[in-house]
Structure formats: C-alpha cells, structure tokens
Amino acid sequence: MADAAVHGHGDHHDTRGFFTRWFMSTNHKDIGILYLFTAGIVGLISVCFTVYMRMELQHPGVQYMCLEGARLIADASAECTPNGHLWNVMITYHGVLMMFFVVIPALFGGFGNYFMPLHIGAPDMAFPRLNNLSYWMYVCGVALGVASLLAPGGNDQMGSGVGWVLYPPLSTTEAGYSMDLAIFAVHVSGASSILGAINIITTFLNMRAPGMTLFKVPLFAWSVFITAWLILLSLPVLAGAITMLLMDRNFGTQFFDPAGGGDPVLYQHILWFFGHPEVYIIILPGFGIISHVISTFAKKPIFGYLPMVLAMAAIGILGFVVWAHHMYTAGMSLTQQAYFMLATMTIAVPTGIKVFSWIATMWGGSIEFKTPMLWAFGFLFLFTVGGVTGVVLSQAPLDRVYHDTYYVVAHFHYVMSLGAVFGIFAGVYYWIGKMSGRQYPEWAGQLHFWMMFIGSNLIFFPQHFLGRQGMPRRYIDYPVEFAYWNNISSIGAYISFASFLFFIGIVFYTLFAGKRVNVPNYWNEHADTLEWTLPSPPPEHTFETLPKREDWDRAHAH
C-alpha cells in the first residue's frame, strides 16, 4: 500500500500486463468495462433470438422452426411440421438472458461499478476483491445459461421451453436437465448481483468525499444505491422460489404440486415479489444516467434535485407492494384486486415527478442535440408511452382482456427495450470518451439513434393493435387476420438488428481509430460531476488525494 500512495494523478503509466489487468482485476473501472463488454456479447445472442422469432412471425404459418430441422431460409416446397418446443426455447432464453444477463449487468454492474465510485470521489469500491468475484460469478451464470440452452430438455430436444418466469407445472415436469441448469444460472447471477449490491451500498455509505453529504451526491450514484437495496431485498426471494422448484424437480417435494398439497399460485406470488422490483432494478440506473445527460446538454442543473432523489426512493419502496398486478387473472379476491390496482397507479406519481422534472430541466435551457441527448429524448418519449400503457394494464377489468396478449408485450418492451436500452446507449455515448480516451464519430451516433428509434417503434407500436385485436403472446403461429401488423413489426426488428450491428461497428471504430480526447471534460461545464475532473481515460488509481469540495460542489465554489 505504501507503494501505491506514492503515485499521484500524474502517473499514467500502467505496468499491468493484459492478463493481469483483465482477468485478475480488482479495479472498479476495469470491472465495469468487463461487465459492459460481456453484457454486449450476451445482448447480441439475445437479439439474434429475437430476430429469429420475428422472422417466424412475419407471415402466418410456420416457415422456419420445423421439426424436420430449423432453417434460416423459408422453403415453400419442403414439408414443415411446427416445432413448438424450439419456439418456447427462443422465448425463454430471450427473456432470461435479456433480464438477468444483459440489462442489469450493463446498467448496475457496468456503469454502476465504473461511475458510482467516481461520482462520490471514492478511490475504489469498498470490497475490490468481492467486486472481482461478482463479475466472475456473472460470467459463470452466463456459461450455465448457455449450457442450459444446449443441454437435453423437453420433447427430446435441447433447451427448456417454459418461458422466462419458469412457472410450474411446466417447469417441474420439463424433462432433461436443461431446466436445472437454467435454475443454477439464475442462482449464480443472483448471487453475483447480491454481492455487487452489498459492495455498492457499503461504498456509497462509507466512502463519499469529504463534505459530500447524502443530499449532495450526484443522481446517478443515488440511483445505483437505491437499485442495490432493491437487489438485496428481492433477489433472495427469487432464490427461494427457484430453490423450491429445484426441490420439486429432483427431491420429491411438492411445494407447487396440488396433488401433494402444494400450490402453483404460491410460486407466482414469490416470483413476482421479486419480478416487480426487478423492473425498477432495471430502470432506476437508467433514470440516473438520463438525469446527467439532460442536465449536461440542456446546460442547466437538474430541476428539483431533492424531489428527484425522493421520487427514486418512493419508486423503490412502492415497487415492493404491487407485485400481484401481474396476477389479476389468477383468481384473487375483489379486495386484493382493488388494493393492487390502487397501489400500482400510485407508482405513476413519483414517476411523473421525475418525467416533469426532466422536462423542467430542459425548459428554458440551451439544448444541444448531441447523440447522448437524442437517446435521452428518445428515452423520455418512449418511457412515457410505456408508462401510459402501464396505467391501462393496472386496471384489473381491462387486464382481464389484455392479459397475455401482445398489448402486454408492447407495454413492457416500451419500458425495458425502449427505456432501459435507450438509457444504456445514452450512457455509452455520454461516457465512451471518458472510458476509452477516444470519441465516437458524431454522425454515426446520430444515425444509430434514428435507426434504432424508428426500428424499435415499428416493432412495438403495432403490437398494441395486435393486443387490442386479441392476439395471444408466446405462440408460434396465428390466424391470417393478424398478418398485417405482424409483418410491419418484423420489418422493425430487422431495422433494429441492423442498428445494433452498426453500433458494434461504431464501438470498435471508436476504440481503435476514434479521435483522441485530450481534455478531462469534452462536453461543457455543466457536466460537473467528479469524473469530468479526471483525465480521459482515468488513470489506474483515482482520487489517491481526496477531491476538494470545490471540485464537485458548484454552490460552494462560487
């Protein structure tokens, strides 16, 4: 330790070899980059599943997923018996990988690890080795997930076709050991997230810069802190549910088997008690990123800092008391339904506070439409659409009609695929220059945004109409009446897929040939959190001399 203290900010020379730096890292910045990189790879796999599903749904009838063998080119002359199991496997792994292995690791593990310590002026995380363990457990979870996909499952085929929620009795009766591997994958990734959450909570509470009281902490650090509490309180519940599943499958218990006095609805309650906080775990770090981006490019401090923090805390608390709105059709009493309706609508209040505060921040600002700001704008617009359909679905009588239709698919993809993912892209474009020391080409970032914006709206907006017409979710085929909007939805999927491939190209171009960034702050003086006082990329050890108050507290500086 005495050695480390000698090197101040001036020492940029990194003596670590490639293997030491990336495989044995305890450095929060390197681990954050590893999380982002891995989430990107898993994201590509999941997106390929999506495109394959949309290919199948582009026209009525089954053209690609055949029992005779899956194909990528439709052949009208060849016989094709629908392979429902393959379809269910696609649905399942798209959901599991996206939820557990892409968005949470990217936002919480990637940006959270990298920027939360920088925002509060901490030299590193509180437990750097635990941080390393969290990342490698996540990698083990990914490996188990992929192994599950390739292991023998139901119908004498590979993989588990049970949907990402793993409902019994499907998941308890699925043959093969694919399902058990999937359960272990979720276990391991959950343990990884819990360890990460403990680390982040400890760091946030104990390692803030001198003078940085709780309500002077930047909003992104707050969002990650609140997310960590949600993870810590909800993931153990999920672990309990899937452990019971494992027992039912392998050890003869009957937690979810009515014949033995169990109850499958019990599983639904336990799962959704995790599953609803889960969606706030996904979106809250996105909120934090968007706050910083909007403040920077509207060239104004964020409007209503304290209500913004309290709104995130309120969303976090309310997120735990609304879980059964996923289960209106599972036979709840009228009183229960009334309560869950009211509680669900209450969440719209703190969410509304945040949306209107973002609008108020931009109001009267001098807005600059750089790429990160475009993503933030897209986020606001699309997240609001998703929120409005959420209010519709919160009504039990309406949910009777919409439950398990494409209306629900449209709703949660507007919030996640067009909310969280736009948050991730906003963060990437906002910080890639800081993380890599090279800046992306502005035209390419803007083109990527417009491709993704148009493509993703083309996918999911028509699905509202399909849901209104009564098209059920999770089916490989559909009557010809639904063909028109399905076709348009699939075209949108191709555009979005192209935009994602283009994005991968932008990232590699930036890392290897992008314009070098020579200044700590390449945006403007309204990017005023501590990472903008450091060189780009930051040195291996940051804040060895703790930051001074005027570095981050604008009120104090003037």
From Swiss-Prot:
Fe(II)-heme a binds at H94, H413. GO terms for biological process: electron transport coupled proton transport; oxidative phosphorylation; respiratory electron transport chain. It is an enzyme of class 7 (translocase). It is a multi-pass membrane protein. His-276 and Tyr-280 are involved in the formation of a copper-coordinated covalent cross-link at the active site of the catalytic subunit I. The keyword Electron transport applies. Residues 60-82, 152-176, 252-262, 332, 396-404, 470-478 are periplasmic. Keywords: Cell inner membrane, Cell membrane, Copper, Disulfide bond, Electron transport, Heme, Hydrogen ion transport, Ion transport, Iron, Membrane, Metal-binding, Respiratory chain, Translocase, Transmembrane, Transmembrane helix, Transport. It catalyses: 4 Fe(II)-[cytochrome c] + O2 + 8 H(+)(in) = 4 Fe(III)-[cytochrome c] + 2 H2O + 4 H(+)(out). It is found in: Cell inner membrane. The keyword rRNA-binding does not apply. Binds 1 copper B ion per subunit. Binds 2 heme groups per subunit. One of its GO terms (cellular component) is respiratory chain complex IV. Cu cation binds at H276, Y280, H325, H326. GO terms for molecular function: cytochrome-c oxidase activity; heme binding; metal ion binding. It holds the Pfam family COX1. Heme a3 binds at H411. Disulfide bonds join C66-C80. Its EC number is 7.1.1.9. There is a cross-link at H276-Y280 (1'-histidyl-3'-tyrosine (His-Tyr)). This is Cytochrome c oxidase subunit 1-beta.
